[in-house]
């Protein structure tokens, strides 16, 4: 009921862009995995206001073994399972913005410092990931795609490939940005301006 009240109030105040993730609620736990999407989906069913909301969610990369039975990655099989599961929990037939929650490759994110390169790490090539997202767009399951917790190199590479190969273009970057964490300004701010890819700042307070 509290969640429903929050969504009712948000929409009444003109807040119509809602972002969630298959991983949520936060802090992430196995027993609450997917619950935020379920609550939003139940609200959609009750209110019949899906068309009033711009809905964003995220597919999780590697790290948490309980996600989708383990072995989660950005390969076509796991990605297909993820998008279908999110659609079911959200009780909708499309997602407005579908984001990669964090990089699949070994790199720095979530505040990690001291980059250590590892050529032995295995990850799906960006072109293949974009190809999978293209299939979801073609099927009408998602409309736009975006990134989260990504680096300047990763963002630039995705944008380069989408232009070269005619694949879906990343439309947004959801990274932390606030008075105590201004790392976005180091490299990603320039990418945002020059390549016209917007920031969805999280933890702004």
PLM regions: where:
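CE4/NodB-like, metal-dependent polysaccharide N-deacetylase domain
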Residues: 78-99
């Amino acid at each position: 009921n509290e969640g429903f009240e929050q969504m009712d109030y948000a929409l009444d105040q003109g807040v119509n862009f809602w972002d969630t993730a298959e991983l949520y609620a936060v802090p992430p736990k196995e027993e609450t995995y997917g619950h935020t999407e379920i609550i939003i989906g139940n609200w959609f069913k009750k209110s019949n206001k899906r068309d009033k909301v711009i809905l964003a969610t995220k597919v999780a990369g590697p790290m948490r073994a309980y996600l989708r039975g383990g072995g989660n990655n950005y390969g076509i099989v796991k990605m297909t399972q993820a998008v279908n599961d999110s659609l079911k929990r959200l009780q909708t037939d499309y997602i407005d913005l579908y984001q990669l929650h964090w990089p699949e490759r070994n790199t720095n994110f979530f505040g990690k410092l001291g980059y250590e390169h590892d050529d032995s790490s295995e990850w799906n090539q960006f072109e293949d990931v974009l190809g999978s997202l293209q299939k979801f767009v073609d099927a009408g399951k998602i409309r736009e795609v975006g990134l989260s917790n990504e680096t300047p190199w990763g963002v630039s590479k995705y944008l380069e490939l989408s232009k070269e190969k005619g694949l879906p273009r990343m439309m947004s970057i959801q990274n932390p940005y606030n008075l105590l964490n201004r790392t976005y300004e180091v490299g990603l701010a320039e990418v945002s301006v020059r390549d016209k890819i917007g920031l969805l700042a999280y933890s702004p307070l």
